[in-house]
């Protein structure tokens, strides 16, 4: 058996040279200007394989749509966001008077801590009547840890925000489970699904989410198609117009699913 003396003299032979690994990117900050004139400032993680390092067009567009429809979508309502990243739609929902907002993303410590940081950044513009919570959540898991944030007597949400989540078509069944478990069975409850096909050749796969939703007790309505001024990634391949386009859908319980 080798002993410690056998390895004397190697020193730093197997030590990685300085600069061998690229330095970790520093966090950056971005701002979302609300229609009300208020500014939501968020920190973006320096880099992350789950894309928490960007403020996506779908997030901005969802936030603006929620603000425009605040009286019917969020005022006094309970809101859940999945795949929130920086959490702008959640924060805007709280600012516009939602009763409860639960902001979630994959239960990665960096993502969750960053969401908490962003919630605290906007605390001064959130009314005292609104409560904003942050949690890690893996799509398809039980929702009871999320509904635990709701006021006594409530066990589901009026609004489910799903911005740029349908890109992962393998996760479509789990996203359907989230809607089935978390969305209140009411004609007024709605899931807001907003996305941009950053890889346009995968758009048909993205869109398979909607017939799957219809097969599982929901009705789907396309509500907007907004072309942004410029693409998020200038050098990416694929149709440039599609990469600038944000698609918006509302998903509600089909009438035959309501009590």
UniProtKB/Swiss-Prot annotation:
Xref: PANTHER family: HEPATOCELLULAR CARCINOMA-ASSOCIATED ANTIGEN (PTHR14614), PROTEIN N-TERMINAL AND LYSINE N-METHYLTRANSFERASE EFM7 (PTHR14614:SF10)
- Positions bound to S-adenosyl-L-methionine: 56, 83-85, 105, 139, 163
GO biological process: one example: methylation
EC code(s) of this entry = 2.1.1.-
- Keywords in alphabetical order: Cytoplasm, Methyltransferase, S-adenosyl-L-methionine, Transferase
Localization recorded for this chain is: Cytoplasm
Q: What is its main location?
A: cytoplasm
Any one GO CC term of this protein is: cytoplasm
Could you tell me what this protein is called? Protein N-terminal and lysine N-methyltransferase efm7
Gene transcribed to yield this protein: efm7
In its UniProt record, a GO molecular function of this protein is:
protein methyltransferase activity
Which segment of the chain is annotated as a signal peptide? none
Similarity-based family: Belongs to the class I-like SAM-binding methyltransferase superfamily. EFM7 family.
State what this protein does.
S-adenosyl-L-methionine-dependent protein methyltransferase that trimethylates the N-terminal glycine 'Gly-2' of elongation factor 1-alpha, before also catalyzing the mono- and dimethylation of 'Lys-3'.
């Amino acid at each position: 058996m080798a002993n410690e003396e056998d390895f004397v003299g190697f020193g730093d032979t197997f030590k990685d040279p300085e600069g061998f690994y690229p330095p970790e990117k520093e966090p950056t900050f971005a701002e979302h200007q609300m229609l009300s004139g208020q500014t939501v400032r968020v920190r973006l993680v320096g880099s992350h394989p789950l894309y928490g390092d960007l403020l996506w067009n779908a997030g901005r567009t969802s936030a603006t749509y929620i603000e425009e429809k605040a009286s019917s979508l969020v005022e006094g309502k309970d809101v859940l966001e999945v795949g929130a990243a920086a959490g702008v739609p959640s924060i805007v929902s709280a600012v516009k008077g939602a009763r409860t907002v639960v902001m979630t993303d994959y239960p990665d410590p960096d993502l969750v801590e960053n969401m908490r940081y962003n919630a605290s950044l906007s605390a001064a513009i959130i009314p005292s009547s609104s409560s904003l919570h942050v949690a890690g959540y893996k799509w398809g898991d039980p929702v009871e840890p999320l509904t635990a944030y709701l006021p006594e007597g409530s066990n589901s949400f009026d609004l489910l925000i799903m911005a740029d989540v349908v890109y992962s078509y393998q996760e479509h069944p789990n996203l359907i489970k989230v809607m089935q478990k978390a969305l209140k069975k009411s004609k007024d409850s709605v899931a807001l699904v907003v996305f941009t096909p950053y890889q346009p050749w995968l758009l048909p796969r993205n869109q398979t989410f909607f017939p799957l939703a219809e097969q599982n007790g929901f009705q789907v309505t396309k509500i907007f198609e907004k072309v942004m001024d410029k693409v998020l990634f200038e050098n990416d391949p694929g149709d440039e117009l599609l990469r600038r386009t944000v698609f918006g859908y509302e998903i509600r319980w089909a009438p035959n699913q309501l009590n």
